[in-house]
């Protein structure tokens, strides 16, 4: 009987241990008139985004049917233009001070933008970076500046395919220069 009790206790302990390791740690960070969510995944990767985001963690679907599209990297959702990509990277780079650029040198920032599929305007941003890098020490105001500048300065010309979705999503990794 004693063995069975120990086995049950060990099983409960093991289940609890694994459940804790698989969960995401969520922190709410208050800025000056804005609030961000900081999720730290089990992999120690940080997801940072505005609490008001409505597309974060929402699947990409067709507007008319609500069904998920097949994954196709060749699918053209926006018209090609060199200006938008370059300007998006410029916005990220200019948000960092020279001192901050030195601190994060050699580390990359993941930048996601969510684009309104009717207007082509950036409506949301999300950032990813490893928790144990200098990127985690950058003030929230830097990410807020990137968000606001993206929303105010970046726009896309959508293709007919891009207009079919609830949003258009782009993601890139960028080393700050």
Question: Can you say where each PLM-predicted feature lies in the sequence?
Answer:
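Bacterial Sec-dependent N-terminal signal peptides
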Residues: 1-27
């Amino acid at each position: 009987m004693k063995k069975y009790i120990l086995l049950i206790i060990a099983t409960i302990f093991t289940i609890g241990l694994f459940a804790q390791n698989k969960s995401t740690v969520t922190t709410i960070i208050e800025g000056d008139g804005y609030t961000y969510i900081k999720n730290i995944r089990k992999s120690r990767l940080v997801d940072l985004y505005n609490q008001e985001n409505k597309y974060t963690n929402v699947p990409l679907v067709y507007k008319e049917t609500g069904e998920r599209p097949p994954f196709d990297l060749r699918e053209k959702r926006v018209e090609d233009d060199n200006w938008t990509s370059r300007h998006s990277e410029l916005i990220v780079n200019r948000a960092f001070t020279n001192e901050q650029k030195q601190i994060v040198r050699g580390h990359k920032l993941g930048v996601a933008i969510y684009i309104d599929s009717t207007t082509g305007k950036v409506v949301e941003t999300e950032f990813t970076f490893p928790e144990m890098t200098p990127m985690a020490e950058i003030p929230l105001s830097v990410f807020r500046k990137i968000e606001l500048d993206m929303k105010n300065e970046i726009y896309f010309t959508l293709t007919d395919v891009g207009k079919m979705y609830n949003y258009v999503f782009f993601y890139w990794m960028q080393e700050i220069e």
